[in-house]
Amino acid sequence: MEVSNLSGATPGLAFPPGPESCSDSPSSGRSMGSTPGGLILPGREPPFSAFTVLVVTLLVLLIAATFLWNLLVLVTILRVRAFHRVPHNLVASTAVSDVLVAVLVMPLSLVSELSAGRRWQLGRSLCHVWISFDVLCCTASIWNVAAIALDRYWTITRHLQYTLRTRSRASALMIAITWALSALIALAPLLFGWGEAYDARLQRCQVSQEPSYAVFSTCGAFYLPLAVVLFVYWKIYKAAKFRFGRRRRAVVPLPATTQAKEAPPESEMVFTARRRATVTFQTSGDSWREQKEKRAAMMVGILIGVFVLCWIPFFLTELISPLCACSLPPIWKSIFLWLGYSNSFFNPLIYTAFNKNYNNAFKSLFTKQR
């Protein structure tokens, strides 16, 4: 998915790095698991400081919480028939990718952080499997966020044309494209010989460092979906601003002699008559739709904001480092890597917090189990 570290072969997060030399790295001065030092030193007992224990504990809790929360969302969607439709299929696709991140990617990344000298000691085959799943799952998670944003955008701006049938077809197509594109980016090095992930001499496991693949993977996995979600939110903002202006123009001044008249209950139009009074034409259906659209727009905004904050430090670093032949301190690389992983924890929190049906389903699920 990226140039050097999405495989998790980042220098250790949970400890101050040992002495490094730029000559240890065969390419851009980055030592990926080839330098000594770290949490566990060869031939020595691991120096488990309080800081090390704290950070490792937090990372283990993050992995467990990411897995359990996304699994809860998946179980709820499977068991509640009302969720067997859009947009919950997009939510389920996101939860699947995030569960796989928690199960297949984050644990081995933590093992790599703790390994002696940050070396990959699990063999070439497992290295390729790990990196392939890393790129596949993280890319799918990112593109699923873009798919949810697109679905909300079309629902808000084209609710008449975006019928249930159209929405079902569009969501199924977006899910298929998401996983197909993610698989292409993940498997391209293996299918087309686009660089090598495993270095047996240095015991190093990392995403292919081929410059052309670096550009292809970072753009396909992050910068393209980033452009999509930013464009979508800009359009949602414009649509909301337009509707707010239209509502203000719908407020009509009434003369002082105007009398109030109650509309039929179906439309629930309310007329108020006072001196210098106004009348607002708004049906209960319009009000309900506007509230729903407002919640959807807020959810999309928070989802996009968290997505950008979690991933942009990592991908900016991975784009700039090869161009300037420079490198951040190892501790920052690890922080940016795990910040990106944490997006898989925040995703289910965000899209369930804005849907009361999920909260009710969670309560019902646990009540039945008792």
UniProtKB/Swiss-Prot annotation:
SUPFAM superfamilies in the cross-refs: Family A G protein-coupled receptor-like
Region annotation Disordered: where it falls in the sequence: 1-36
Any Pfam family matching the protein: 7tm_1
Glycosylation: residue positions: 5
Membrane topology note: Multi-pass membrane protein
Cross-referenced PANTHER family: 5-HYDROXYTRYPTAMINE RECEPTOR 5A (PTHR24248:SF202), ADRENERGIC RECEPTOR-RELATED G-PROTEIN COUPLED RECEPTOR (PTHR24248)
Protein name: 5-hydroxytryptamine receptor 5B
Organism: Mus musculus (Mouse)
Taxonomic lineage from the root: Eukaryota, Metazoa, Chordata, Craniata, Vertebrata
